[in-house]
Amino acid sequence: MGLPAQLPVTLLCLLAGTAHFIQGRRGDIILPEVIKTLNILTERKTPCTKLMIADALAVPKNTTEREAVCRAATALRQFYLHHKVSWCFKEHGELGDLRLLRGLDRNLCSMAKLSNCPGKEARQTTLEDFLDRLKTAMQEKYSKRQS
């Protein structure tokens, strides 16, 4: 008893359609997830949020939204991979926040869909200010998407 010759082709088409649907839905989920994570991180006022991070949100006007998001992800990654930052989060028992920053980085990279972006920003700001401004930008993006 064999399978009809058209069955594998049909299954492949269904699988491809499902993957496209899931990928599209993932994009709809990422932005609210980013905002939720930023809400959690900005509510907590801890010593580690006073640490300095590259001000990747101060971008030239001709920067695309994807580039800006990619720069923010790069700045976050460079920030949380630094040994002094990891030490601060461990010292103050904030490993959950460190995990949230890593997840935020992953989600921002997914939103940007860029593999390489500049990451050396001259200006510095506190993590607290960076996260507040990023949250405002993401909320504005979400509002535009809803209207």
Swiss-Prot record:
GO terms for biological process: B cell activation; immune response; interleukin-4-mediated signaling pathway; negative regulation of inflammatory response; positive regulation of DNA-templated transcription; positive regulation of macroautophagy; regulation of immune response. The keyword Glycoprotein applies. Glycans are attached at N62. GO terms for cellular component: extracellular space. It comes from the Eukaryota. It holds the Pfam family IL4. Keywords: B-cell activation, Cytokine, Disulfide bond, Glycoprotein, Growth factor, Secreted, Signal. Residues 1-24 form the signal peptide. Disulfide bonds join C48-C88. It is found in: Secreted. The keyword Signal applies. One of its GO terms (molecular function) is cytokine activity. Coiled coil: none annotated. PANTHER family: INTERLEUKIN-4 (PTHR47401:SF1). Belongs to the IL-4/IL-13 family. Participates in at least several B-cell activation processes as well as of other cell types. It is a costimulator of DNA-synthesis. It induces the expression of class II MHC molecules on resting B-cells. It enhances both secretion and cell surface expression of IgE and IgG1. It also regulates the expression of the low affinity Fc receptor for IgE (CD23) on both lymphocytes and monocytes. Positively regulates IL31RA expression in macrophages. Stimulates autophagy in dendritic cells by interfering with mTORC1 signaling and through the induction of RUFY4. This is Interleukin-4. It comes from Oryctolagus cuniculus (Rabbit). The gene is IL4.
